[in-house]
Regions:
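Cellulosome-associated attachment modules in secreted, modular CAZymes
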Residues: 13, 17, 743-809
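Consensus positions within tandem repeat domains that build extended binding/scaffold surfaces
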Residues: 77-80, 100-105, 123-128, 146-151, ...
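Small/polar residue-rich beta-strand/coil "junction" motifs that cap repeat-based extracellular fibers
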Residues: 707-711
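GGW-centered surface loops in extracellular recognition modules
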Residues: 21-49
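Disulfide-bonded cysteine-rich modules in secreted/extracellular proteins
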Residues: 23-34, 267, 658, 662, ...
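A recurrent domain-boundary module in secreted/ectodomain proteins
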Residues: 730-747
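Structural signature of tandem-repeat unit edges
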Residues: 35-37, 53-75, 85-98, 108-121, ...
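Sec-dependent, cleavable N-terminal signal peptides
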Residues: 1-24
Length: 809
């Protein structure tokens, strides 16, 4: 054991110097590491910053001697003086050729320092956070300036970059907030990302002729720049700027050649393409002349050149890039050459002084937002070759009066003409197949539109808010009218829906308050939610015989609607579908309907009667609530669920007629006042109805099963078949009626042929009677279904409706 301890102590003794010190020797308070015949200045401790080794004025010798050996001092090691905040000055010998990364990081007290002309590289973070440095001279020997080399040297007021520098790395001078002037020498080829970001005292930049690449946001937040000087226009036009804020012009706004500001720009003949961001923000430009050599104009090339008044694009140019002339608010005249094929996204957005536009026939695509928010634009000629009008192409061109979309156009993009307030007329070419989302929304002055037959889809909100539109004709190829397509077209009074429309989507015609009549063609299968809600002038609706679904609130608040016939194709009507149609007096329901949803007819206060067809099984909460004018209701035995408040506040119901056969399974019929009750032959049970009858007409030969909840009062008169009088007088609960009358004629409304049931044969018998006048064997009194004391063709219609509303065969 003692041997092992001794061995461990011996190893520790050998390693201990290495653990406590990273230097090889020290001379005159300077610490060194040996590398062959050379010495590198380093720090004292086992890690950088362990001790504040250096303070005051430091002088590094050319040579240093240790143990009789002389070494040439050739480099400053990594982290050598890191965070030595008390060091005020430093002299380096000409023998030093390399300065390591982080060498002077955080030396905030360092005010005077000269980089020897022997140094070839300034590495990453070398002088980072040396906030006391005021004057920096990068010697001609230096080739590269590393990443964050002078990051946040906030006291630096003067910077001289040597002519040997070819690359300035990212963040190299970021946050040098006192720097006012900058000259990039001509040997520099690349300025990397954010190299001069937040140099917010910088006013002047001179760009050398050798620069070809400027990285992303190289001059970001250099907000006090006023002047950029180029040595020559040709190399300037060839610089590849990564972003707008890579170009110092974005903030400076003024470009100089020598002492003269460039206002009338002539692009050199040697230039074939204007690069991205080349003149972005140069508001001092008033004109630009392109040579025929130029074939393309890059993205943001002249964006926000607010002084430009006139631009002529030569025929050699094929493509105008994204936002190329964005925000050129002074541009009043634009001539596009006949070689241009594509106008890029937002190319002329916010050119608010532009008044007229002629698109040459060479142009096939006007991309997204190309002329959006050109508020002064009043006249547009789109040429005859444009195939695509991109999204937002002419959005908020508030001065635009009239647009003719040529036959070449296939698609009109989303919001293409959104918010063109003064546009009164649009002619849509006969090749357009799709009208995009909000394409013409809020064109408040648009008077009308004719959708040609080639159009298949009208997308959501396409014409929403066009409140001066009085007419809309939808072509015969349109299959879908999108959600809110014509919402708030408050003047729309003349509407034609094409014969191929299959779906009318949510709120398609919502709040079209001038619309009086709608014909929904037989092609339509679905009328979606709120499609015609708040069409307050709508009096007449014809629903085609292919509609299967009417969505919720579809015709709600259509207060002028007087009657509706729901075709038998309809299987579903959503909640609130006809809510508050306060002028509706009659409605005919589909015999395919199974459910009347919650509040479907709530507030139809003029409705006089309702016949619920025999297909219905469920009547929902408030289905007919507040139908104050409702006097007569017909309920089939198919109903298995009748909501307690289905007829809430229907104070004037005086007649309840059951139809069908078998048991009443609907439960309580919640009507508070006394009513006349009619029960046909074939009903076998009326348990749980909970009705207060003023009079009951029960035509069943066998008294239907009854319970204590069938009737709440027995003071009214019970009319029964004379032949069944004794049976009712003896039947439980029926016998409780104070006055039971046996009618000599067994009156079953609709039983024309006297077989004690109502069927299609009764319709045939009634028609024959009306044609021949022969009533032999008929009970004609049973045919007066509308109680007008005469039998006419109107009773045939009533009899058919009775059959459709019941399970009777």
């Amino acid at each position: 054991m003692q041997t092992m301890i001794k061995t461990a102590l011996t190893v520790l003794a050998i390693l201990l110097p290495a653990l406590v010190s990273a230097h090889d020797f020290e001379v005159n308070g300077i610490y060194y590491n040996i590398n062959g015949n050379e010495a590198t200045v380093t720090y004292q401790g086992s890690y950088a910053g362990q001790y504040n080794e250096y303070s005051g004025a430091i002088v590094i010798p050319e040579t240093v001697t240790n143990d009789g050996i002389t070494y040439a001092v050739t480099s400053i090691g990594e982290h050598a003086f890191e965070n030595c905040s008390d060091m005020t000055s430093l002299e380096l010998p000409s023998s030093v050729t390399a300065i390591g990364s982080w060498a002077f990081y955080g030396c905030s007290g360092l005010k005077s320092f000269e980089i020897p002309n022997s140094v070839t590289t300034i590495n990453d973070y070398t002088f980072c956070r040396c906030s006391g440095l005021t004057d920096v001279v990068v010697p001609n020997s230096v080739k590269t300036i590393g990443m964050s080399a002078f990051y946040t040297c906030s006291g630096m007021t003067n910077l001289s970059i040597g002519t040997g520098v070819i690359s300035i790395d990212r963040y190299a001078f970021k946050g040098c907030s006192s720097l006012t002037n900058l000259t990039i020498p001509s040997n520099v080829h690349e300025i990397k990302e954010c190299a001069f970001e937040q140099c917010n005292s910088l006013t002047n930049v001179t760009m050398g002729s050798g620069v070809t690449i400027v990285g992303k946001d190289a001059f970001l937040d250099c907000t006090n720049l006023t002047k950029v000087t180029a040595i020559d226009l040709t190399p300037w036009c060839r610089i590849n700027f990564a972003t707008q804020k890579a170009n110092p012009l974005y903030y400076a706004h003024h470009l100089y050649l020598g002492a003269a500001e460039v206002t009338n720009l002539t692009i050199p003949a040697s230039i074939t393409s204007i690069g991205d961001y080349t003149f972005t923000g140069c508001s001092g430009l008033t004109s630009v002349s392109f040579p025929n050599s130029v074939t393309g104009i890059g993205s943001y090339a002249f964006s926000e050149c607010t002084g430009l008044t006139s631009v002529t694009i030569p025929s050699a140019v094929a493509t105008i890039g994204r936002s190329a002339f964005y925000g050129c608010t002074g541009l009043a005249s634009l001539s596009l050459g006949n070689g241009v094929t594509t106008i890029g996204s937002y190319a002329f957005q916010k050119c608010s002084s532009l008044t007229t536009l002629n698109i040459p026939n060479s142009v096939t695509a006007i991309q997204e937002g190309a002329f959006s928010r050109c508020e002064g634009l009043s006249s547009v000629n789109l040429g005859n070759s444009v195939v695509t009008l991109g999204n937002y192409a002419f959005e908020v061109c508030t001065g635009l009066k009239c647009v003719v979309i040529p036959n070449s156009v296939k698609t009109i993009g989303s919001c293409a003409f959104y918010g063109c307030d003064t546009m009164t007329d649009v002619i849509i070419g006969n090749s357009v197949t799709a009208i995009g989302y909000s394409a013409f929304a809020y064109c408040h002055s648009l008077k009308g539109v004719v959708i040609p037959d080639a159009v298949i889809t009208i997308d959501n909100s396409a014409f929403s808010g066009c409140n001066s539109m009085t007419s809309a004709k939808i072509g015969n190829s349109v299959t879908t009218i999108g959600s809110s397509a014509f919402e708030r077209c408050t003047s729309l009074s003349d509407l034609t829906i094409g014969q191929s429309v299959a779906s009318i989507r949510n709120s398609a015609f919502r709040n079209c308050e001038a619309l009086t009549s709608v014909v929904i063609p037989n092609s339509v299968t679905e009328i979606d939610n709120c499609a015609f809600i708040e069409c307050s002038a709508l009096t007449d609706v014809t629903i085609g015989n292919s509609v299967t679904n009417i969505g919720y609130s579809t015709f709600a608040e259509c207060s002028a609607l007087t009657s509706v016939a729901i075709p038998n194709s309809v299987t579903s009507i959503g909640m609130d579908a006809f809510k508050n149609c306060s002028g509706m007096t009659s409605i005919t329901l589909s015999n395919s309907l199974t459910t009347i949803e919650e509040s479907t007819f709530e507030g139809c206060s003029a409705l006089e009667s309702i016949v619920i067809p025999g297909s219905v099984t469920t009547v929902g909460y408030h289905a007919f609530a507040n139908c104050y004018g409702l006097a007569s209701i017909t309920l089939p035995t198919s109903i298995t669920s009748l909501a307690y408040y289905a007829f809430e506040s229907c104070y004037h119901i005086s007649s309840v007629t059951l139809t069908g056969e078998g048991e009443w399974r609907g439960g309580t019929i919640s009507i508070l006042r006394a009513v006349s009750v009619s029960i046909p032959n074939g009903i076998t049970s009326v348990k749980g109805m909970y009705l207060k009858p003023s009079v009951v007409y029960c035509y069943a030969m066998t008294p239907p099963a009854c319970d204590a909840n069938s009737f709440t009062d027995y003071s009214g008169t019970l009319h029964v078949p004379a032949a069944a009088l004794a049976a009712y007088q003896a039947a439980p609960y029926w016998q409780n009626f104070m006055n039971i009358v046996g009618d000599a004629v067994e009156a079953t409304p609709g039983d024309v042929n006297g077989d004690n049931k109502v069927s299609i044969s009764d319709v045939s018998a009634l028609i024959n009677y009306l044609l021949s006048g022969d009533d032999t064997g008929l009970k004609i009194a049973n045919a007066d279904l509308n109680s007008d004391s005469k039998v006419s063709i109107a009773d045939v219609s009533s009899l058919i409706n009775l059959l459709l509303s019941s399970d009777t065969e």
